[in-house]
């Protein structure tokens, strides 16, 4: 027997049973719910629904315990093996979206420069798709690895990402709409910062005033992840300093 599994699973079962009783759920409604769960599995949207409703809670718990930068959900579109880039992510030749410069420094939780830290950067195409996932877009586009220099500094150029909808024709989208919500995520950029001996930092940053920033369907937007509008030389700028914490030994 696994005591932790017993503890968490029992609490979940108790909470569901309490809700069924308090809401006086009918047998017809119960059967509809069972059917919905079967459709969710058939549509391969279990992870989508869990991300939309619960992932932000897990991230908030992690944020309370970290000494580093605020984490955020990874999402389903991270791919290992992105190319190391020098200066810019690869984008469509006809990408007319506003240029974006992302720059800053990576430091350890004791304030030292995190020289050689590797930063995975990935974001949507101008039409809200992800390379390597949608429409056979080559995996080396709109994603790449940036290596911090001896002072922990990094910089990369790309273009502005776009808001997009999570799958909205399947069970998850149907449920969100029945609840009076929507299926839109605001434009954002994902980051995963890694360095030997340190805990990986997975996070994402948003744009002040952007569509859906105040009503993200996945509830992933925290105030300190929203970047103010700043432009230089015709490009929008995100100044982001990351703090990574030393990996903790598990006894």
Curated annotation (Swiss-Prot):
UniProt cofactor note: Binds 1 Fe(3+) ion per subunit.
Enzyme class, UniProt record, top EC level: oxidoreductase
Record keywords, A-Z: Aromatic hydrocarbons catabolism, Dioxygenase, Iron, Metal-binding, Oxidoreductase, Plasmid
Matching CDD domains: 1_2-CCD
Top-level taxon of the source organism: Bacteria
Enzyme Commission numbers on file: 1.13.11.-
Pfam families assigned: Dioxygenase_C (PF00775), Dioxygenase_N (PF04444)
NCBIfam families from the UniProt entry: chlorocat_1_2
Family recorded in the similarity comment: Belongs to the intradiol ring-cleavage dioxygenase family.
Name of the featured protein: Chlorocatechol 1,2-dioxygenase
Gene that this polypeptide is encoded by: tcbC
């Amino acid at each position: 027997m696994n005591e932790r599994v017993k503890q968490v699973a029992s609490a979940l079962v108790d909470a569901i049973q309490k809700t069924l009783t308090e809401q006086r759920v009918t047998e017809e409604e119960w059967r509809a719910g069972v059917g919905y769960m079967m459709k969710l599995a058939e549509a391969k949207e279990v992870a989508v629904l869990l991300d939309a409703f619960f992932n932000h809670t897990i991230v908030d718990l992690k944020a309370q315990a970290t000494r580093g930068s605020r984490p955020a959900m990874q999402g389903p579109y991270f791919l290992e093996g992105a190319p190391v880039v020098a200066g810019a992510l690869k984008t469509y030749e006809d990408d007319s979206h506003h240029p974006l410069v992302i720059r800053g420094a990576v430091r350890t939780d004791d304030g030292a420069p995190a020289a050689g830290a590797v930063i995975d950067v990935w974001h949507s195409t101008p039409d809200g798709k992800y390379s390597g996932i949608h429409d056979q877009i080559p995996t080396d586009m709109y994603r790449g690895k940036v290596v911090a220099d001896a002072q922990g500094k990094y910089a990369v150029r790309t273009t502005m990402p776009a808001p997009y909808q999570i799958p909205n024709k399947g069970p998850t989208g149907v449920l969100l709409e029945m609840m009076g919500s929507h299926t839109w995520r605001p434009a954002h950029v994902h980051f995963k910062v890694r360095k030997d001996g340190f805990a990986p930092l997975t996070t994402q940053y948003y744009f002040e005033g952007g569509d859906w920033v105040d009503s993200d369907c996945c509830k992933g937007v925290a105030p300190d992840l929203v970047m103010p509008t700043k432009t230089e030389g015709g490009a929008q700028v995100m100044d982001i300093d990351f703090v990574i914490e030393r990996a903790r030994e598990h006894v």
